Amino acid sequence: MSIDWKCLWHDPFFHIGLLAKIVLILLIVPTVQEQWFVPFVVSVIEQPTLSPWTQFLQQGGDPLAFPYGLMMLLVQLPAVLIGYLADGIFGISYFSGVGFRVSLLLADLLVLLLLVKMFSKYVRKLIVYYWLSPILIYITYWHGQTDIIPVSFLVLGLFLL
């Protein structure tokens, strides 16, 4: 899958959206991620098991913590692991959450790239209406929901048809 990055990289609206999303990733800590999602993924990193949901509940974890399946967990694990290692180096618990949010940004970027590949005539419209969508930005980067990950799988499936 070859994607011409130039069409995105040279668009100032792409840069505006990317900068805004990075700033939100660094400055906003959504409550659902802080209280539920990130602690669950960190518990999987600290105590790997074949049944992470059962183990998390047995250790007194919140049943609402991570109501997603294995694919969602596998998507989140690499970036959270990198953040977790950085947390250990610096002695804080900040970068695990940043890693979680970076994985959402990567899924968001994947959706944009696939849409650009499928609809190359409409690059500017895709950037303006998808990449800069206030709904997407609010749901993903402000509220902290992970819906962009299954959306990226859906768009990837459509792309591969």
Language-model features and meaning:
Residues 11-15, 74, 102, 127-129:
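Hydrophobic alpha-helical transmembrane segments
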Residues 105, 124-137:
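Transmembrane and membrane-interface helices of multi-pass
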Residues 113-117, 149-161:
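Specific aromatic-rich, kink-prone transmembrane helix
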Residues 141-149:
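Short acidic/glycine- and proline-prone juxtamembrane loop motifs at membrane-interface regions
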